[in-house]
Amino acid sequence: RLAPEYEAAATRYGVSGYPTLKDGEEAGAYDGPRTADGIVSHLKFISDKDASVVGFFRDLFSDGHSEFLKFAHTNVESLVKEYDDNGEGITLFRPSHLANKFEDKDLLTAYYDVDYEKKTFSHELSDFGLESTTGEVPVVAIRFVMQEEFSRFLQDYFDGNLKRYLKSEPIPETNDGPVKMDATANDVPSPYEVKGFPTIYFSPANKK
């Protein structure tokens, strides 16, 4: 017979057989092998520091759910509502040590330890109006050129306080000839796309 405090816990969590293994308030009962090796294997799985992928499904007999059973799944209503408004989907859960203060922000790609003198990267600086590599260059650029400390630059970017850099030649003193531009020295405005040279677009006079 269980001690009173354990009997209350067993009643609260619906424990009717032994051994029963539960993890968390909303977790379902462990339904794996009722052996020491099976339980240890399950505990190692849920305590592993690697990222976890959890599937949410409306239909427990769908092809997607059947395939996902090879990994992990849940149909606990509260969890489904908390992590997926549509009631179905796959969610990646990462350990907290991988989180940072810039989560849920724009995707940032940073180049570092790059030799801009090499041909492969020589055009990267010119795209941001930085033609010389002899002096200091920004740590990062996100269509904006960094002017100061890195974290402040990122915060200003996320707050929308940065002025976007557009590669552009000086305005010509005279511009009475055919409309033309050097796509290697200027950012091409939308909706035009340049994939080769020469590229010609026709815009009717009444649809500029």
UniProtKB/Swiss-Prot annotation:
Keywords: Acetylation, Adaptive immunity, Disulfide bond, Endoplasmic reticulum, Immunity, Isomerase, Phosphoprotein, Redox-active center, Repeat
Cellular localization per UniProt: Endoplasmic reticulum; Endoplasmic reticulum lumen; Melanosome
Major subcellular location class: endoplasmic reticulum
Keyword Transferase: no
GO biological process: adaptive immune response; protein folding; response to endoplasmic reticulum stress
InterPro entries: Thioredoxin-like_sf (IPR036249)
Record note on modification: Within the major histocompatibility complex class I (MHC I) peptide loading complex forms reversible disulfide-linked heterodimers with TAPBP as part of its protein folding chaperone activity. This is essential to assist the dynamic assembly of the MHC I complex with high affinity antigens in the endoplasmic reticulum. Phosphorylated.
Protein name stated in the entry: Protein disulfide-isomerase A3
Species name: Mesocricetus auratus (Golden hamster)
